[in-house]
Amino acid sequence: MRSVLVPPAEHHKVLFEPIDIGPKTLRNRLYNVPHGTAYGTLRPATWASYRAARAEGGWAVVSTEFSSVDPSSDEWPLHSSDIWDEEDACRHKLMVDSVHDHGALASIELHHGGVHALRRLSREPALSASGMSSDLPPPACPPGTPKIMSRNDIERVQQSFVNAAVRARDVGYDIVDVLAGYGYLCAQFLSPFHNHRTDGYGGSLGNRARFWLETLSQVRDAVGGDCAIATRLAVETQGPWGQSIDDTVALVRMADPLVDLWDLNVGSLDWGSDISPSRVIPEGRNLELFGRVRRAAQKPVVGVSRLTSPDLMAQAVRSGLIDIVGSARQSIADPFFPQKVLEGRTEDIRECMGINHCISSLDRGNLTCAQNATSGEEFRRGWHPERFDVLARPEVSVLVVGAGPAGMEAAIGLAKRGADMVHLVDAAEHLGGHLRPVGRLSGLQEWTRFIDHRMIQIGKLPNLQFIPSTRLDADDIRDYGASHVVVATGAQWSGTGLTPGTHAPLEGVVEGADWVFTPEQLLIEGRRPVEGSQVTVYDAEGYYMGAGVAQLLADEGYKVDLVTPHAQVAAEADMTLEGSAIRDSLHGSGVAMHREVLLSAAQFGRIYGVGQFEEPFTLETDALVLVTVRVPVDGLYQELVRDHEALEEAGIEAVHCIGDALSPRPLADVTFEGHRLAREFESPNPAIALPYKREPLRLVRRGAFSDPLD
């Protein structure tokens, strides 16, 4: 049930004041800044539909990710966007028109990677200010020494920026943003770390800025009468040889006449400085730095700082730290954030948890979100972030057993589709399943925003009832009176040390032994090893749990060893840009870390395994915490589906198993599955996902290829 609309709170009204940037006017102060999706111009319909949802949700500006200006900055396989030629421009036009259809301005970020460009399709040599190789280690960037850009190279690349800007203007972009941050080509010229030139493009700050200033000037001359000109600039690169805030203030004064908008961030190629997860940086950390630039600039400033609270956003604008609020992750989690604030429905906001699943999924080729299952599915599956189709047969009663992430998502979706009755039943007292105790780990408190949002939505839906502290067996379910049953009973960590590396339990480990622990026993049951004892955490998962419980135990005074078969502790956390921070924290807490060790056996007092080169490994320990694999808790489902006659007699038409009970996976995946079940509840077989739309190329009858957008 939708709440009664009220005007935005008085302290939020500043967010909805229009502001001029050059020849364009923003309808409010909420700016969807450049951010990657991995869709780009290779999946233009997916890309356009994703951006259009943000425009429909009320953002004043919707931006592309970085768009490569010519083949010397080919970024394959990053699946970013290109604007090299008219074919690319046609694909951009689809996105621009989709954004304009909802009243937002469209912005493009023009990019050249310089020494960091991947060039795997173009196979051109990397270009650089002065022949300094990429500081990205293989395989992130190909090895090799880049070409020092000649004057001809400089002019050619600058012309590529101009040509790209003209193409952007011609397809309707309102804002052209020249990327001078994140350690790419313009930033490489600005940086004394990369720029060792002795000509007019190196040496002093003014000389190092010359390439960037000339590029801005040429772009402005070409399209500045039609488009607003912006540039994305790091206020600090946060490295020992980088760009300081004082440098940035000087750069802003140099370039202020050439731009209409300053698009600010923090950090360089280590973009974790700018978009670290909530475990690492607090909301609004960079605002004071932006304020220093704002005081030096004559043009408006947009800044990003992991802002999710409309209160803090409004305060930042009112206090003059920024003029416009930049957001990427919050727009992924809730495309309709602006509309909800405008309508006074802040309680309905899906607040970004800052877990950076979006970053890890982007790097794997498809941006998705743990908080918002519809992100990236707007075209592929036709899902709208706020609207559901009504069930063709709403006279159904659905029993959802298990109120973890998948169960909550399925129950809410079915209730929003108009099911007569949805009961969400859990043996625990509170919503959340395994996610609730995760919030007790250091730095992961904001993960429980997932639960908070769904708790509010459940309270608003009159046809959805949460029934806590109720454990149901198969007989209870058959007697319940529901026409449909969804089993979402989750998973539990293996108590025997079953691992991916051996596909077997640890020899000598007996589940339930008083010296063996699982994360559930530590976080839910409150069990602990003997005070002051030596504890080993065996982490075969490699994400948040192993490092999290190691940190917890170290903070409680235990002597902790963390053993992992992976090449790095918390290796998966590198994908979410928090691995280094996790390892630094563990090291600072005295946790001894042992990498590339595969355990095979354990007994009270000692564990056994092999190292990277098959050398024997042994370690004395008083207690062993097993963070290896999660095992589905699917016994209830299996018992139900074994007896089809009993289900038929009970009037149960279908039983579905979802989430970790089906297959233990990351939060985003089980959330997606619960959401998909609700969306496809009346499909011929809801257990199997309906086909999604694929693009951009399809075979045609004559054997050639065609674009589905033609």
Q: Where in the sequence are the language-model features?
A:
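Flavin-dependent oxidoreductase catalytic cores
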Residues: 1-401, 405, 409-416, 422, ...
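Beta1-alpha1 glycine-rich phosphate/pyrophosphate-binding loop at the start
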Residues: 262, 393-465, 537-577, 581, ...
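Internal hydrophobic alpha-helix adjacent to the cofactor/substrate pocket in enzyme cavities
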Residues: 334, 339-340, 410-412, 549, ...
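Helix-enriched interaction subdomains in cytosolic or periplasmic regions
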Residues: 353-366, 476, 482-509
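Glycine-rich dinucleotide-binding loop and its adjacent helix/turn
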Residues: 379-391, 457-460, 466, 494-556, ...
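A Rossmann-like FAD-binding core segment of flavoenzymes
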Residues: 448-494, 511-514, 518-527, 531-533, ...
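Active-site-proximal substrate-binding core of FAD-dependent oxidoreductases
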Residues: 572-575, 661-663, 683-710
